[in-house]
Design a protein with these regions (language model features):
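Positively charged, polar, low-complexity stretches
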Residues: 2-43, 47-87
Length: 87
């Protein structure tokens, strides 16, 4: 059985400490907005999303060509359509 609270903590940490400031900010804001509204399957999909390298995540978000085949699921759709306003 999955410990949802532990999974959320892991996801929050990984979202905010990616390696590039741009992706730290983008994924951190995305996770902060949605983390408490996600079901177990969505959390597992978000964990899978975080396993993708920053370049492909950035390109996918911005509609550029990627070297990765993104699944069609709720998380990828939310991420692709996330309205990130950098401060």
């Amino acid at each position: 059985m999955i410990n949802i609270d532990e999974l959320k903590k892991k996801i929050i940490y990984r979202s905010n400490y990616r390696g590039t400031k741009e992706m730290d900010n983008l994924l951190g804001a995305f996770t902060k907005k949605y983390i408490n509204n996600l079901n177990e399957n969505d959390l597992l999909d978000l964990e899978k999303l975080l396993n993708i390298d920053d370049t492909n995540l950035y390109n996918f978000y911005n509609g550029f060509k990627t070297d990765f085949e993104f699944e069609t699921n709720n998380i990828n759709s939310l991420y692709k359509n996330f309205d990130y306003k950098q401060k």
